Amino acid sequence: MLDFFTIFSKGGLVLWCFQGVSDSCTGPVNALIRSVLLQERGGNNSFTHEALTLKYKLDNQFELVFVVGFQKILTLTYVDKLIDDVHRLFRDKYRTEIQQQSALSLLNGTFDFQNDFLRLLREAEESSKIRAPTTMKKFEDSEKAKKPVRSMIETRGEKPKEKAKNSKKKGAKKEGSDGPLATSKPVPAEKSGLPVGPENGVELSKEELIRRKREEFIQKHGRGMEKSNKSTKSDAPKEKGKKAPRVWELGGCANKEVLDYSTPTTNGTPEAALSEDINLIRGTGSGGQLQDLDCSSSDDEGAAQNSTKPSATKGTLGGMFGMLKGLVGSKSLSREDMESVLDKMRDHLIAKNVAADIAVQLCESVANKLEGKVMGTFSTVTSTVKQALQESLVQILQPQRRVDMLRDIMDAQRRQRPYVVTFCGVNGVGKSTNLAKISFWLLENGFSVLIAACDTFRAGAVEQLRTHTRRLSALHPPEKHGGRTMVQLFEKGYGKDAAGIAMEAIAFARNQGFDVVLVDTAGRMQDNAPLMTALAKLITVNTPDLVLFVGEALVGNEAVDQLVKFNRALADHSMAQTPRLIDGIVLTKFDTIDDKVGAAISMTYITSKPIVFVGTGQTYCDLRSLNAKAVVAALMKA
């Protein structure tokens, strides 16, 4: 089974190409041109590229190159004959067009060689099946005939080799004892201390002697290692007659030092935060500058190098192969041509956690974009669709509006008012944790932060924010900022109106001169009407500068449902004429999904809003900005 067969001129014009199993022959052919033809390494007509074996034939008279590719694990004996037959027939059939040796004549020439090639391929395959009848192998040709006869004879009373090896240690203990022998079985000459040779009636081959010498050498050194191991074990003193008590896994612990809880503690005071490991809390990296998200790995780097090979080849061809860059247009794409490829792409996107409806819409958009487009000769339907899909995904992840919080905060400072950010989302996605990360990032950039605890529903929500505030205060104490308090928690306990607490927090921040107010809200499901009404009221009354939706990178179809219903609820329950909707997205738990990054596509596609932050860990420095190309590369990785 052939992957491809192509015929092109040394000027770079593809005259004819047959696509078999392989999706595209561009990469292997470019590698052949760069590594073999341009380097004048044509001594061998075979070349291996990744999983393919390429065989080629040069026609120096007409400046043609014939290349065939197939899987390197296959042994196709008819390939050489096929290349010769194709070369001969193609040259004779199109001699007139080829002899003109001009690019225009080759462009205008019609090389309808498909039927002839299939006929030659069928004849070559049939000829390879006609072989001489196989004969049965003789005993002299077998491996058993090459072994010495002595090695296949088992003497009565002789133990097999494996049992003899296992019983060597037991027999060594009995050696040197004064008692009578435990057995009277005859010992073969090869296992006794007697020399083995013709004088004892045993003849061994040269290979058998070498093998026995090797075994004796290994046994001598093995005994030395056993003695050294025994000596090291015996060095450790052991108490005789005493047995260490067994410690059960779930049996508790009776150690007094472990059970003693009477030591004084600070019970969560700020002094306890100062004694904690600051580096462990802070994490590694520069907190003031957001790094781009990196989704690559060692496999991705290798794939990236392979993907850059065709482009590098195009830059180095020059001269003789300078016209290789898509001068010939072969066919225009239709929906029937792209149907099977788009089905595979859709399944691939769904497997990478893209919502099913959005995957269908993306493939439909690509089909509309490519319908009627003319492909290049070396371009296949798969490569063309994949390239168009990649461009569409990058465009989706780069929306028109870009959220620059630092610039907006500086603008709010000039107006002498705090910059207000509200966090919303479903339960358990990490709103409070990522609020603390963003607080640390703002503190590293020199802005003071007031955290408003407006989650008055979940037990422990205020205590969680108090812990983050204490740790952030330890990282940025007032002493480092001229006595100015950089981070503070504003809370009114549980059961209060969240909108009223947010309003008081904003007024407090304005009076105390805080730069940013981060409002934490309670987690709520998108179908909970009372809680969604309370959220819409909070946003309408306080009019924050930025509304961030916090979502997990683990969700698939659920992401679409969450965002659609959140926006719908904010619009339905808002009392303003122009309701305030979600402005941006914070994508959390991105370090747990490997390359299944489809949630980023789903959330951005459904809202047309940017992903402002990406959470990648559990320390304050584990905050990244989205790199669209890295996400798309991870998404398209097979």
UniProtKB/Swiss-Prot annotation:
Compositionally biased region (Polar residues): 304-314
**PTM annotation (Phosphothreonine): residues:** 284, 578
Binding sites annotated in the UniProt record for GTP: 425-432, 520-524, 588-591
Its topology with respect to the membrane?
A: Peripheral membrane protein
Q: Quick one: where's region Disordered?
A: 132-244, 283-316
Q: CDD domains this protein is in?
A: SR_alpha_SRX (cd14826), SRalpha_C (cd17876)
Listed under subunit, the entry gives:
Heterodimer with SRPRB. Interacts with the signal recognition particle (SRP) complex subunit SRP54. (Microbial infection) May interact with Zika virus strain Mr-766 non-structural protein 4A/NS4A. May interact with Zika virus French Polynesia 10087PF/2013 non-structural protein 4A/NS4A.
What name has this protein been given in UniProt? Answer: Signal recognition particle receptor subunit alpha
Native species: Homo sapiens
What's the encoding gene here?
SRPRA
